[in-house]
Amino acid sequence: MFSKVLVANRGEIAVRVMRACEELGVRTVAVYSEADKHGGHVRYADEAYNIGPARAADSYLDHESVIEAARKADADAIHPGYGFLAENAEFARKVEDSEFTWVGPSADAMERLGEKTKARSLMQDADVPVVPGTTEPADSAEDVKAVADDYGYPVAIKAEGGGGGRGLKVVHSEDEVDGQFETAKREGEAYFDNASVYVEKYLEAPRHIEVQILADEHGNVRHLGERDCSLQRRHQKVIEEAPSPALSEDLRERIGEAARRGVRAAEYTNAGTVEFLVEDGEFYFMEVNTRIQVEHTVTEEVTGLDVVKWQLRVAAGEELDFSQDDVEIEGHSMEFRINAEAPEKEFAPATGTLSTYDPPGGIGIRMDDAVRQGDEIGGDYDSMIAKLIVTGSDREEVLVRAERALNEFDIEGLRTVIPFHRLMLTDEAFREGSHTTKYLDEVLDPERIEAAVERWSPEAVAGDEEEGEVTERTFTVEVNGKRFEVSLEERGAPAIPLGGASAAASASKPSGPRKRREESDEGGQQVIEGDGESVAAEMQGTILAVEVDEGDDVEPGDTVCILEAMKMENDVVAERGGTVSQVLVGEGDSVDMGDVLLVLE
């Protein structure tokens, strides 16, 4: 076993890997950006190294900085976690060619499976069903139209290196092809350094089923059952569970064995996930995630196997010490991603300070996180701040236990998806397990989400009170040895967050022109004002593209900018028509919430 492992990641997954290392007697090394110098993974590690500024491309994605940190720390292995460099075959090869051990599949296997067209061909050869489409990259929009001619609309354009919905664009008609083709290529280049895309028939109402795989360097391949990840918004998983409530025993066995065949054909080792779409009793290969998954936790809960420990053991050359028949699924488990997002605003990323952070406990409750009360949640990285994993003897017990746990979970200082999760636990389709990947985006009434937020959001989210609203403050007092909670209401008072934080200023939206301060050439600040209507950023992020120029006429609903926040593209649209009089941002600019992007006359 290794003596010291560098974890090339941040947040909860970095801490998860470090905990596994600690139980194996392995020392840990963290890397961090300027934005994460007080991060939970830095606090947990035995030692830590700064690898650059907040921008991921200059820190967590910088190959040489990560490897140099491993050299400074005298580590003997590098674990990538998930995201960032976890599925980057070029980085894996650099690690393999260095003095370090790569905790993951070989670079060759990653290349075979990381490029989706190669993976589709390989799976077809292994007698694993695939969705109809191309087995070569699409060179032009005409290739997309050709697939649509063969199979009909809608079709999906997917980035070769994509995953998690990034670089995936659904085309419903021919007039959408050109724009979506370019967007998919741009996202592929931005997120995965690979602008190649492929095309396949888009299934209308599938389940998203994935199989956890472990394979060692001695020829042993095991599957640990399936997970159901069908509850998604914008192709991003929200709640995952194991086992799936939608599979028959026959289909479950067929999918598991297909996953083993495909992985064996790819000469794959270490942990991985084979993802499938299931519709009308048939299953189709989608992709292989050549890394640990966010939702590996539910598999651990129902199998009793520590997937991360096995990653480390396999990388150290150990042999899997259990057979396929030894793998037994017991009970049921669900994972609730606790994202800093505003569900009522189409899950827009949120930022703020965790003025209160008090997670639940009790039997069947597991928390994977790397935050504590008082931490600042910025917009530089993914919006997930924690994972709540709830396990019970069956799905019904998990649903009841999850209601209790989410009711217990106390977070204040920023928006989270907890009200949405509580809504899902009352939702008939989810409780029955009949939902598909389209349920949130196409079926669920948005007004129900708004009502859930009104019902279950904290009463004092910092900066969210409008002037004149009633603010409730709760005090604990003791009278004759007995404790009482006393609530006082005051109209127009600012909310006072718990945890010693200072009162936040009102975030009410001003009317009329807004201002944006920019650095002038002389280094001072200049104030840019417009008499027209300002189009402002609703969140912190980076400008990926500006779709208009000064002098352009726009209509209500037209996209004027594309803003990336927490790894998601967000269209900034004009609320009314007009002529663009000023464009105040350019591609690559970082903006804060409220910054004016352009002015319409």
From Swiss-Prot:
> Which organism was this protein described from?
Haloferax mediterranei (strain ATCC 33500 / DSM 1411 / JCM 8866 / NBRC 14739 / NCIMB 2177 / R-4) (Halobacterium mediterranei)
Subunit structure comment from the entry: The propionyl coenzyme A carboxylase (PCC) complex is composed of three subunits: PccA (biotin carboxylase and biotin-carboxyl carrier), PccB (carboxyltransferase) and PccX.
Q: Which SMART domains match?
A: Biotin_carb_C
- Region listing for Disordered, in residue ranges: 495-531
Catalytic activity as recorded in UniProt: propanoyl-CoA + hydrogencarbonate + ATP = (S)-methylmalonyl-CoA + ADP + phosphate + H(+); N(6)-biotinyl-L-lysyl-[protein] + hydrogencarbonate + ATP = N(6)-carboxybiotinyl-L-lysyl-[protein] + ADP + phosphate + H(+)
Q: Where does biotin bind?
A: 347
Keyword Nucleotide-binding present in the record's keywords: the answer is: yes
User: So, what pathway does this thing act in?
Assistant: Metabolic intermediate metabolism; propanoyl-CoA degradation; succinyl-CoA from propanoyl-CoA: step 1/3
- Location of the Biotinyl-binding domain: 526-601
Which GO molecular function entries does the Swiss-Prot or TrEMBL record give? ATP binding; biotin carboxylase activity; metal ion binding; propionyl-CoA carboxylase activity
Coiled-coil regions listed: none
| Residue stretches making up the Biotin carboxylation domain | 1-445
Positions carrying N6-biotinyllysine: 567
Q: Which residues bind Mn(2+) 2?
A: 287, 289
What positions does the entry give for Mn(2+) 1 binding?
275, 287
The entry's function note states: This is one of the subunits of the biotin-dependent propionyl-CoA carboxylase (PCC), the enzyme catalyzing the carboxylation of propionyl-CoA/propanoyl-CoA to D-methylmalonyl-CoA/(S)-methylmalonyl-CoA. Within the holoenzyme, the alpha subunit catalyzes the ATP-dependent carboxylation of the biotin carried by the biotin carboxyl carrier (BCC) domain, while the beta subunit then transfers the carboxyl group from carboxylated biotin to propionyl-CoA.
Fetch the NCBIfam families from UniProt: PRK08591.1 (NF006367)
Q: Write out the residues that bind Mg(2+) 2.
A: 287, 289
- List ligand-binding residues for ATP: 148-209
Q: Which cofactor is essential here?
A: Mg(2+); Mn(2+); biotin
Q: What is known of its domains?
A: Consists of an N-terminal biotin carboxylation/carboxylase (BC) domain that catalyzes the transient carboxylation of the biotin covalently attached to the C-terminal biotinyl-binding/biotin carboxyl carrier (BCC) domain.
Q: Give the protein's recorded name.
A: Propionyl-CoA carboxylase, biotin carboxylase and biotin-carboxyl carrier subunit
Q: Where is the ATP-grasp domain?
A: 120-316
